[in-house]
């Protein structure tokens, strides 16, 4: 799988899902598409986790200055 961009992988994952939902694939084709989809899903998940680690929040201090802190998302 030579995907470098999140958006590309997400589009390919959406295409795989549409194929699987269409019900037109043989069992073997469905299994192959499913395996491909799992790879795209893992890639997207990895990229989202990397992005989340890079996000920071801007916090205003009492003196009016600003500092950045790591983003603490919902978990």
UniProtKB/Swiss-Prot annotation:
Per the record's keyword annotation, is Cytoplasm included, yes or no? Answer: yes
Give the reaction(s) catalysed: Exonucleolytic cleavage in either 5'- to 3'- or 3'- to 5'-direction to yield nucleoside 5'-phosphates
From the Swiss-Prot or TrEMBL record, state where the protein is found: Cytoplasm
Q: Name one Pfam family in it.
A: Exonuc_VII_S
- Keyword field contains Repeat: no
Read off the Gene3D superfamilies from this record: Exonuclease VII, small subunit
What's a BP term from Gene Ontology annotated to this protein? DNA catabolic process
Cellular component aspect of the GO annotation? cytosol; exodeoxyribonuclease VII complex
InterPro entries in the cross-refs: Exonuc_VII_S, Exonuc_VII_ssu_sf
User: Taxonomically, which superkingdom?
Assistant: Bacteria
> What EC number(s) are associated with this protein in UniProt?
3.1.11.6
* Top EC category: hydrolase
Q: Name one GO molecular function term.
A: exodeoxyribonuclease VII activity
Q: Where does this protein chiefly localize?
A: cytoplasm
What keywords tag this UniProt record?
Cytoplasm, Exonuclease, Hydrolase, Nuclease
Q: Which NCBIfam families does the protein's record reference?
A: PRK00977.1-4 (NF002140), PRK14066.1 (NF010669), xseB (TIGR01280)
Q: What does this protein do?
A: Bidirectionally degrades single-stranded DNA into large acid-insoluble oligonucleotides, which are then degraded further into small acid-soluble oligonucleotides.
Family assignment from sequence similarity:
Belongs to the XseB family.
HAMAP family linked: Exonuc_7_S
The annotated subunit structure for this chain is:
Heterooligomer composed of large and small subunits.
The protein depicted here goes by the name Exodeoxyribonuclease 7 small subunit
UniProt lists the gene as xseB
């Amino acid at each position: 799988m030579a995907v470098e961009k999140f958006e590309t992988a997400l589009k390919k994952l959406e295409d795989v899902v549409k194929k699987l939902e269409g019900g037109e694939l043989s069992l073997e084709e469905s299994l192959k598409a499913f395996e491909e989809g799992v790879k795209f899903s893992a890639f997207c998940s990895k990229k989202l986790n990397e992005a989340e680690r890079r996000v920071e929040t801007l916090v205003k201090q009492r003196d009016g200055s600003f500092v950045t802190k790591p983003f603490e998302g919902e978990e």
